[in-house]
Amino acid sequence: MTKRVRLSDSFNPVYPYEDESTSQHPFINPGFISPNGFTQSPDGVLTLKCLTPLTTTGGSLQLKVGGGLTVDDTDGTLQENIGTTTPLVKTGHSIGLSLGAGLGTDENKLCTKLGKGLTFNSNNICIDDNINTLWTGINPTEANCQMMDSSESNDCKLILTLVKTGALVTAFVYVIGVSNNFNMLTTYRNINFTAELFFDSAGNLLTSLSSLKTPLNHKSGQNMATGAITNAKSFMPSTTAYPFNNNSREKENYIYGTCHYTASDHTAFPIDISVMLNQRAIRADTSYCIRITWSWNTGDAPEGQTSATTLVTSPFTFYYIREDD
């Protein structure tokens, strides 16, 4: 027979059954209390068992909330509490990104909008076409220029490259003969031929008026870019530096130089070049013009034979002040 523990004389039989002499609780649960969800802490004091995120700190059952959450003081609802700084924006319960010019979304991904002349290359943005260059291409497959008055069709190739560099344009030009009449010029002692280029106010070549019959375009690799250019004004000779119809400043509109023709016997014949910028317009819709004249006057013709030899001039480079964009 097991002996029962004898309670002290100071034991208080009223819950929580405290022993007044020792202030100890005898770990006695009243019969009407289930331990599920409750605990004694300290002994004899009934409390709730709380697991995170619940807590009774402060005396009442509460919900622990971390950063970004709050409990509404009015209706007690749990709400998000997130602020944003630019360029993030908050609309309702959603966070978005404020997009400026040049940015967009594609398949829910932030992306850069690229305009004409730009492309991606190995995730880097690069210039698709060289918009600082305007040219005929390296060597056109067919004759693109008609210089001789007697010609009824294109008689030579004009290779022209215009490159913007700061306030200047660098021009690179030479000629390759195609027709027999044009190449026969090499058998004359005194000749000249001129390429006239007329442009509208946007810098587009007026092919119906010009010696060059194919439009200029930007450079794309070693080829001409596809599609028409919209504005090439910045490649044009400045009308301030090279005005039209100003006789007092006419000499400022000319550039002079020399290139060569190499004859069949390898003799280099000098060719005089003169470039006239603007100065004279032949029609009201002509806003800019470039005239390039090649000439020679020698004691002997470059080619003594009567059969034509392809007339190829050496390249000539000149510079001029360009028009503003």
From Swiss-Prot:
One GO CC term on file: host cell nucleus
Induction comment from the UniProt entry of this chain: Expressed in the late phase of the viral replicative cycle.
Main location: virion
Transmembrane segments: none
Location of this chain's protein in the cell: Virion; Host nucleus
GO process terms (BP): adhesion receptor-mediated virion attachment to host cell; cell adhesion; symbiont entry into host cell
Swiss-Prot/TrEMBL keywords: Capsid protein, Host nucleus, Host-virus interaction, Late protein, Viral attachment to host adhesion receptor, Viral attachment to host cell, Virion, Virus entry into host cell
Family the entry assigns: Belongs to the adenoviridae fiber family.
Role this protein plays: Forms spikes that protrude from each vertex of the icosahedral capsid. Interacts with host receptor CD46 to provide virion initial attachment to target cell. Fiber proteins are shed during virus entry, when virus is still at the cell surface.
Oligomeric and partner information: Homotrimer. Interacts with host receptor CD46. Interacts (via N-terminal tail region) with pentons.
Further comment: All late proteins expressed from the major late promoter are produced by alternative splicing and alternative polyadenylation of the same gene giving rise to non-overlapping ORFs. A leader sequence is present in the N-terminus of all these mRNAs and is recognized by the viral shutoff protein to provide expression although conventional translation via ribosome scanning from the cap has been shut off in the host cell.
Domain comment, as recorded: The tail region anchors the fiber to penton base capsomers, whereas the shaft, built from several repeated motifs, allows the knob to protrude from the virion.
Name assigned to this protein: Fiber protein
Lineage, uppermost ranks: Viruses, Varidnaviria, Bamfordvirae, Preplasmiviricota, Tectiliviricetes
